[in-house]
Amino acid sequence: MSFRTIEWRDDAVIMIDQTRLPMEEVYQRYTDFNAVAEAIRGMVVRGAPAIGVAAAMGVALGAREIIADTQESFFRQLENVCDVMARTRPTAVNLFWAIERMKQKALSLKGNPLETIRTGLKEEAIRIEAEDLAICKNIGRHGADLIPEGATILTHCNAGGLATAGYGTALGVIRAAHEAGKRIQVFSDETRPWLQGARLTTWELMKDSIPVTLISDNMAGFFMSRGEITCCVVGADRIAANGDTANKIGTFSVAVLAREHGIPFYVAAPVSTLDLSLADGSRIPIEERPSTEVTHIRGLPIAPEGVKVRNPSFDVTPAKYITAIITEYGVARGNYTQELAALAAV
């Protein structure tokens, strides 16, 4: 890929600013963990795996900022850093997975000089980034086998390199199929209200010369009814033990339409997105974002001032609508409670 979503460079976190795409390709440099937290909250970086990487790097930055004379003081302040990161966005489980992994790394180094702990946390964050890229490649490899020659694939939101450390989950499947020489094309839902499909997915696919057609969200059923969609591939922000999947708002609607038209609906996500502590999706927290994301586009009002707005950022697709869940360790195909538990144990 010709861009980097996030990286650690010269003791700073460098992120492509996704609020500026596709008009401007701007990279932001962060040396303060609070600024990284605000970047996550403000969607400078977004997508569950990328949020996890950003949170890990934010914790590593925070550890470098801590001034402490004792281990107790250091770990007390580090807990505060982790709490700040955890409060940024509630739905993406990768955020909490990455923070917990950083906590465990710090605890494993307890008793060593503080500089050793700081270095260990930086190395762990960089390792999480590298692992995520490898994971996405494996997801792509497993998923590409499900994509037939000549397929037209509908995707929703952006689950590509911009949503991960690189390559992507849903777009990783698409990229892998393209790299395998399959003739494919993509239909990208625009994904209101934040327009990740219009702004980000099309930008990524065009950079990779993968044929892509942009459609508005309310056109999906039309193209399915005409037989123009072969399959759907989306990412995920949290998957419950039974396969219920939280993803960008509008995913549920696409899944229902796909089921009605007999079109396979695939979810592509790393095992770190599984939340086996939840029996089903009913307890997945759903983030509500500011009303201005609905009433304004690029700062311009499109609705009457003072109108009541609801803006849930995610919805939950029941497992019965999902044909298969593609992970880095293999594909779960319907008996999700058993199969996802087995994949998580690999």
From Swiss-Prot:
Pathway(s) it belongs to: Amino-acid biosynthesis; L-methionine biosynthesis via salvage pathway; L-methionine from S-methyl-5-thio-alpha-D-ribose 1-phosphate: step 1/6
EC numbers, comma separated: 5.3.1.23
Swiss-Prot/TrEMBL site (Transition state stabilizer) positions: 157
UniProt cross-references to InterPro entries, sorted A to Z: IF-2B-related, IF-M1Pi, IF_2B-like_C, Initiation_fac_2B_a/b/d, M1Pi_N, NagB/RpiA_transferase-like
Record function comment: Catalyzes the interconversion of methylthioribose-1-phosphate (MTR-1-P) into methylthioribulose-1-phosphate (MTRu-1-P).
Record family assignment: Belongs to the eIF-2B alpha/beta/delta subunits family. MtnA subfamily.
Protein name per its UniProtKB record: Methylthioribose-1-phosphate isomerase
Organism this protein belongs to: Trichlorobacter lovleyi (strain ATCC BAA-1151 / DSM 17278 / SZ) (Geobacter lovleyi)
